[in-house]
From Swiss-Prot:
UniProt protein name: Ribosomal RNA small subunit methyltransferase H
GO terms for cellular component: cytoplasm
UniProt family annotation: Belongs to the methyltransferase superfamily. RsmH family.
SUPFAM superfamilies hit by this protein: Putative methyltransferase TM0872, insert domain, S-adenosyl-L-methionine-dependent methyltransferases
Principal location: cytoplasm
């Protein structure tokens, strides 16, 4: 792998350590990427352990060949939202000792201009995690209604100027279609008046389009529910998120399943019954990267790690 597209796994020790790995355990790396977390898991597993890695990026599947000679490892080409389906096919429901998810876009995807994720590198406006199928960002921008674009920019990018940007895109695309990242980034920079300090004006819109094109938040919801289904008692969830939308979903999921089902006041139900509805317990507080890690890897700055354990009821 070229140095240009090298990937530094964020919160590596903390995330893998949070899985509390057993020698003969069965683990899932739901976001293989370039294998940083998988490598650490394999180093801690015994000879009877097992690691199932998942990724929908064809380049990640290619990178997984580095572990082809390790009988403990297997790679699945698909989205982590379907992890419960993959585990069911393998007959391992209720036997998984840990699930790791490193959410969002990876450094190699951002750094490769041909993938179209970055407003800093000119390339085709693609943004698909799996670039072998599905609609590209350029195709969506060419057909989307103004209202739909504004909703996506506001909901997934928390963009204050969502409607104005959507209108300008619609007006400009009739003359020249948006086919490259630079086309879109330049337009947003040109029409944005109140620019945020130390943040490119296109940051939020690019994030929003990427999340929409890849159904990222739906994938997270599905993966979390799936993990709850497949985890063994005392199995661990170790999840890194990179922006507030992701972290909010993870935080609320852990909180909801740590508190148990809410019941109307006065309903005749015992404390034991309420406890049995609890499926998770949070392990410690949210973990942030150290100043030293941020200095080594600026992309770690916004990362948050949350760890939870499946309860045995």
């Amino acid at each position: 792998m070229s140095q240009e597209f090298a990937h530094l796994s964020v919160l590596l020790e903390e995330t893998v350590g949070g899985l509390n790995i057993k020698d003969d355990g069965i683990y899932i790396d739901g976001t293989f990427g370039r294998g940083g977390h998988s490598r650490q898991i394999l180093q801690r597993l015994g000879e009877n352990g097992r690691l199932i890695a998942i990724d929908r990026d064809p380049q990640a599947i290619e990178a997984a060949k580095q572990f082809a000679d390790d009988p403990r490892f297997q790679i699945v080409h698909g989205g982590f939202g379907q992890l419960a389906d993959y585990v069911e096919e393998l007959g391992l429901v209720g036997k998984i000792d840990g699930v790791l998810l490193d959410l969002g876009v990876s450094s190699p995807q951002l750094d490769d201009a041909e993938r179209g994720f970055s407003f800093l590198r000119d390339g085709p406006l693609d943004m698909r995690m799996d670039n072998s199928q599905g609609e590209t960002a350029a195709q969506w921008l060419a057909r989307a209604e103004i209202e739909d674009m504004a909703w996506v920019f506001k909901t997934y990018g928390e963009e204050k100027n969502a409607r104005h940007i959507a209108r300008c895109i619609a007006a400009d695309r009739d003359k020249t279609p948006f086919l490259r990242t630079k086309d879109l980034a330049d337009l947003i920079a040109r029409i944005t008046k109140n620019k945020e300090r130390n943040k490119h004006p296109a940051t939020r819109v690019f994030q929003a389009i990427r999340i929409y094109i890849n159904s990222e938040l739906d994938q997270i919801d599905q993966a979390l529910e799936g993990a709850l289904t497949v985890l063994a008692p005392q199995g661990r969830l170790s999840i890194i998120s990179f922006h507030s939308l992701e972290d909010r979903i993870v935080k609320r999921f852990i909180r909801r399943h740590s508190q148990g089902e809410s019941v109307p006041h006065g309903l005749p139900i015992t404390e034991d019954q309420i406890n049995k509805s609890r499926k998770l317990r949070a392990i410690g507080k949210a973990i942030m990267p150290s100043d030293e890690e941020i200095e080594r890897n600026a992309r770690a700055r916004s990362s948050v790690l949350r760890i939870a354990e499946r309860l045995d009821y």
